[in-house]
Amino acid sequence: MGYGLVKDDGSVFIEKEATEGVYQAEQAGASAAEVLSDGLEFVPTKELLERNNRTSTVETVVSRVGQKSMAGTVPTEFKAGANEGDETETAALYEALLGGKDALLERTSLTSHTTTKLFLTGGEELQYKKGHIVKVKQSEIAGVDHVSPIVEVDSTFGIESITLLVPYGSAFSDNVKISASTQFYHKSGQPTLSVTNYLGGEIREKAIGMRPVSAELANFATGQLPEMSFSLEGLDFAREVGTPLFDPAYDSQEGAEPPVVLCSKVYKDATELTLNSLSISFTNTLGFLTSTASCSGKISSRVTKFQVGFTINPYMENDDVDLFELFEDNTGFSIFGSSNNYGASEDEKEQVVAFYMPNCRIPEITTGDEDGILTDAINGTAHRDAGNDTIFLAFI
């Protein structure tokens, strides 16, 4: 018998399940996720069934236990893969949260571009959709790499193109490249996950049939490292003695790092906002299917509602009340932001992370302050509209 398991000697592996509720062990070292140590937890429970029996005493009789449940929190850094177009090592969590995933290939554009429109070889525009966030590799020719959401895809013969939300400072160069990337957006049919948490590297804890019920993009604040934390619920659990089947292989070993939130612009529509912090919350409402034939009680789950909210605190302008008017008139607008690391120069943006909410509303606005400087403290909501999903996340 031994004691003294060390917390940070543990590792976490995440796999999509082929069949919901059937445990999927790790298939490779790349299934490991480099999670944050603080806040990581899994809580197995059984429903307590109290027995209110009269037994000639006020003492209670032994309770029984019913349905099994598993809840967990997986905090992570909000970062891209080491190389352009790579999936982030936590891609399974994002796919389980949102459902939709597109892997975009690098494209070389044609000529005669504008500050927002890029012309493409016919057919190459078809991989894009409204809301995808792209990086134009302008630094390879002359200038600074440019990151923006797509607001229009045109497949008209002879003028196949994509149009960007945020204009570049001048017309894009001929034959400029558009980066490969991985994009996530909401789509039904999200996979369930098996999460294996190795406690101290010696005890195998299994969380089975897990779905994210909520997530939060936090710490997107001046000079900080952004984080994405996932809260999950599932169908079943188990714990046994066991060591990892594979040595963990982390993105950081290949050079992936979270960006520092500096030179990280946030836009309302195509207008840059001056703010100190931003957060985005995701909520999946789950409905569980149960069966008397199941030994754990729950047999499946479904996402019955998806909601996105955000908070921003732009500094209050001294010559307009535009944000208050958006609140008063319930007018829609978009929010887009990104952060990145750098390549050989600060013109070359690498390991870009970005978010885009095309259709936002402000149900609540108050007056706040940052070190005594007035701000508009905004609680907003994001919604789907014609041709757009509620939110897009991009890793470039």
Regions found by a protein language model. Name each.
Residues 1-396:
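Signature of extracytoplasmic/envelope-associated structural regions
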